[in-house]
Amino acid sequence: MERKSAKQRIISDIKSGDVRIQVTGYIKQIKTKDYLLLDDESGPQIKVDIKNVDVPFKEKHLINVIGDLHLTMEGEKEIEADIIQDMENLNFEYYKKIYKIKKTL
């Protein structure tokens, strides 16, 4: 079975109808071995379920998360991570500017 491609989003642009997304941001907090909080500086943070992936990164590390979007019983958005990539060499300020430009096209 083929997976859908992940839509590139910033946290504040995530829609409830999104199925598979990718979000780049900083690890704000690693709560347990089960999840972390991701912050892309767009406002809100998002909970990332990391039960199915290895996370060799620490807090404040820049990562890209690819996974399925879920809504919790409380109505919060959560990403079930399939892939986590190291993005430390990315110029995050330029990335955010390019994202805004692509959004207007």
Predicted regions and their residues:
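OB-fold and OB-like single-stranded nucleic-acid-recognition modules
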Residues: 1-105
